[in-house]
Amino acid sequence: DVIPKDALITFANCDKNGSIVFDCDLPVGFKWYAKEIATDAHYILSDTKYEFDTEYQGQDIKVIDIKINNDKAIENNLIYGSVKGLKVDRETQEVIKGATFGLFKSDTTELTEENAILTAVTDENGIFTFSNIPYGEYLIKELKPADGYLDNEDVFTVTIKNNEQVVELTALNDKVPEL
C-alpha cells in the first residue's frame, strides 16, 4: 500500500504531564513529521511540523525511540486579545475624557477598583484600552465618571476567543443636570 503525502497515520493526546507517545508501526527509511491537529481553546493551534526519520536499526531492534524538537518541550502560546472602548456623551455624541473603567473576571460580583484586574482612564479621544487579555470572558464597568457626568451602572460582557482579537465597545454617559 502507498501512504499519501501528508496523510494522518495516527494521533495521540497529551498525558497529565504533557507528554505524548505515538504507538504505531512506521516503515523505516522514510521522513515523517508530527504536527498539532487540535489544542485546548485557550491556545493558538500551531502549524509547526516536527520532522523526523525512521532509520533501520538492525534486525534485533523491535522499537525505535524517536525524540522530536531536539527532545525539548514544545510550547503552546495562549490566545491574547484586547478591548478598546469609547466613552461618549449620550446627548451631544462628544467624546469624554477622564472616565475610569475596570476589567473584571466574569464571576466577579463586586465590581470595585480593588477587585479589578486592570483599570484604564479615557484619553482626550474618549478611548480606553485593555491590552494582552488572555482568552476568556470578562466584565467591564465604569468605576468613576468623568467630571461633570453621572455614574454609569452599565456592565459590558466581553469575550476574547481569537488571538489578537480587538473587542470594541461604546459606553454612553449623561451629564450631571444643571439646576
Question: Which residues does each predicted region cover?
Answer:
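Solvent-exposed loop/turn and edge beta-strand elements of beta-rich ligand-binding domains
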Residues: 1-179
